[in-house]
Amino acid sequence: MHTRLISLLVGCAIIAGCSSSSNAPRAVPTSPATNTNGTPPTAIVTARFDPAAGVIPFPNNLLLSGTTDLTLNIPVANPADFSNPQVALNALDGFSPIHPWSTSFSVGITTNGLLASTLNLNTVRVFQVSLTGPGGGVTGVVRELAFGVDFIAALSSVDATGRTLAIVPLRPLAQLTSYMAVLTTGITDVAGNNATPDTTYFLAKRTATLITAPAPTGGCTDPSVSTDPLLPRANACGLEPLRLLTNSHLVAAASRGIPRDDVIVSWVMTTQSISPVLAAVRSTVTPAATTLVPTGLTLQAANAALPPIADIFIGTIAMPYYLDAPTDAGQTPSIVLRTFWQARPGAYIPPFNAFGLSPTSTNLTFANPLPVRRSTQTIPVLLTVPNAASQRTRPAAGWPVVIYQHGITRNRSDALAIAATFASQGYAVIAIDLPLHGITDRANPFNIRNTPFFAAGARERTFDVDLVNN
């Protein structure tokens, strides 16, 4: 179960009064602050970073903190309420490879927002990075993403105040890959005031430990104490792991020429897996026999606008099904809209089976990629084969076959519309329906109810459930 409290961030709750702290043992006189253009600041512009209040750049690997199965761990009120999008996100093993990133700024009341022209290749940097492990610190930079080629940065179109920066991928990011964003002081508001770190990030940038005798992961061990008189022990203990993560960002950024003092905020995100689950399913699927019989109809009999150059066959195939079905014992029709693929509890593959992960988790991830088969469903198949009218000769090895995949909300019979074109070139066309799709018109001769296969247990993939009005 995902916890409400993110333990890594527990120390961030009451540090607002600690911003005067520094690495120096005592305060020393300094020159008046100026912006990089030489003007005195007229407002304080901070890159907002307050994890205790849930204010962090998104997506962010901090939301993996406390995970028990390598999925996201966004704090939610009810982990069982999958109508909450954040609960659904918590079943994923990473973040979207295409969705924009965002981070916010607190702009002074005398200004009108961030200056868009300062969001450029010098102030917004994105790197592909390697980590110590899932959600861990940065160990190195793999490559830098190109501004204007791989991504752009701009003011968010959904924030009229001009306080939100959006980083928009221009091409999909790689799956199961970590990326680090680094923003610098070159970002300004319209008055020329340079952006600065928020209090928590300022403390996390410190090079010196916040506690004496820290644990290897940054937590407190007795009798450790805070190294800063203005920072209570509990807060220092909670911030030390964050300091270690942040410093790993800054070391990596420095390796690419970004001075530590110029960084106003940084964060890392890891993209979700895309192919492991489908690859795991494919590895277990074996060829299945297809039963096909001629209908005695040609394409023209099905649609008068089509030439009669292919014969139509119908049939069935038995397929594994990974969702609950209304035909299962005790299930109601609405079950088709309320279930999703699940893994066998705790069935992690090596090396993750040695990580001490949750033995009860059923989330499908790169660590537990094989879904549980709920049933075997006998589903309809539609096939067209060139006939003599096509003036094509059947090859000795048989007709080459085109697999047709219909679009969302459509069905397998759409294959008939292109079957004539393929038949004229000597191709057979075969089609099945997407899950929860099928022919809903009871008068359609290809509806499985109108064939002998229905009596043998075959069903449309809609299970004859009205998925539109229910």
What are these regions (language model features)?
Residues 14-17:
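C-terminal motif of bacterial Sec signal peptides marking the signal peptidase cleavage site
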Residues 21-334, 340:
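Acidic, low-complexity Ser/Thr/Gly/Pro-rich repeat segments typical of extracellular/periplasmic
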